[in-house]
Amino acid sequence: MKNRLFILTLFLIIISCKAQVIGTLEQFEECSKRPNRDQDGCPDLENITYVKDTNNRLDQFVGTWKGSANGKQYEVKLEKKINYKDDPSDVRSFDRIIGRILIKDSSGNIIYNSMNKSDKDTYFFGDNFQNRSYLMYFVGNYNCLEAGNVFIETRINNPNEMKLFYSQDKDGILNPAKCPNFSTYVPFLPTQTMILTKQ
């Protein structure tokens, strides 16, 4: 009787657990390089429910980084999130980097701060690798069309230094009433490569 009860309990546990189909960041990086990806997608990866950092490539970015550019001081805090979903209803979860940024002007005045924002509200999150660079997406002042890709990469000979490059999209519809100074607006992140040092 005990064996039957054990088998029945085990069977119910197995049925109630929804199996995760695990893929790797490397598989999704390879998918992004396929010549016909825009048309064909990556059908071999469609059933994956969790994109895992199996080789711990994200770990090199975790920590607090500081640097300066164009008279501004930057503090960037990067955290690795495991099995992360933006929304509980998302079909797929990822191991990814979530970033927070503190920017001060030359007088020490805070001009941007997402340090106390929830993970979902930092608007600075990772996507995937492109060779050695990790691709993230940043949204600053969206009313002034400040959004785009951020590429981060630690140096091979000095893993305590990281290059950060911001490529602003400038996509969207500009409403001059919400960004009256658009012609002179300077994005929060520099559009030239910036070097940050791990603290």
Where are these regions (language model features)?
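Amphipathic/hydrophobic helical signal segments and adjacent flexible N-terminal regions
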Residues: K2-T64, A69-G71, N83-R96, Y166-Q199
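Conserved long hydrophobic alpha-helices within structured protein cores
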Residues: N70-L78, P159-F165
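Central antiparallel beta-sheet cores of small beta-barrel/beta-sandwich binding domains
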Residues: V76-N149, R155-N157
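Beta-strand-rich cores of mature extracytoplasmic or soluble domains
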Residues: D121-Q199
